Amino acid sequence: MTKILLIRHGQVEGINPERFRGREDLALTERGRREAQSVAHRIAAAWRPSAIYTSPLERCVSTGAAISEACGIPTQVLSELNDIDYGAWQFERYDEVEAAQPALFTAWFTTPHLVRFPNGESLQDLVARTANAMRLLLQYHVDETVVAVAHDSVNRAFLMQLLDQPLSSYWWLEQQPCCINEVDVVDGRVRVKRINDTHHLSAAAAHLSGPGLPECPNE
């Protein structure tokens, strides 16, 4: 059995006002670094990964580094795990894009499977790229546990394929910062055991701040 742990990076800078962050190389916030430590400790305690792969972007590399330190194994960059390419919308503010291209902006949030970003990717491109990443992980890590640290868009693309869901379901799958998605693959059969699991973050927040801390925002 091959186990794949899909992890989203921790919280990043540049989230207010909301932007199409995509491939903007943003650093983790202090909160994001705490989230990375929390998910790292949980992975080290619950599983024994033999490999850690990350997106080339700093927020994933930093999250992967925390997991690497906790588990005692190195990380490798896998370009197929890079965030979606928003093209001309890269790091533009939501409100400004909505004002300039209202129809396409609305389409992205209602019919994402029909959208190609100007000079960027479509969901079809993203799914093809992540499918290749999945093949590589399964080919080189038979009967092992592998960690892949990526982005909400990448994790959604993985999960849509594994759950045999249409691309129109993109927004149905929430991915919080430093969440865990656990997938087992046995003889080509897939079992998704957990999605968007953030129990480790709640426990860490309670330990640091006591009861009443609000839940982590989806950024």
Please state what every model-predicted region is.
Residues 2, 73, 84-98, 139-144, ...:
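Acidic, low-complexity terminal tails and accessory targeting/binding regions
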Residues 54-55, 128, 149-150:
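Short beta-strand scaffold positions
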Residues 104-125, 218:
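Short glycine/proline- and acidic residue-enriched helix-loop micro-motifs
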Residues 10, 152, 198:
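Active-site metal-binding loops of divalent metal-dependent hydrolases
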Residues 3-7, 144-150:
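Beta-strand elements within well-structured catalytic alpha/beta cores of enzymes
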Residues 2, 8-73, 77:
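Active-site-proximal alpha-helix that buttresses catalytic centers in soluble enzyme cores
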Residues 29, 33, 57, 98, ...:
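Amphipathic, non-transmembrane alpha-helical scaffold segments
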Residues 13, 59-61, 83-85, 154-156:
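Short, active-site-adjacent cap segments at secondary-structure transitions
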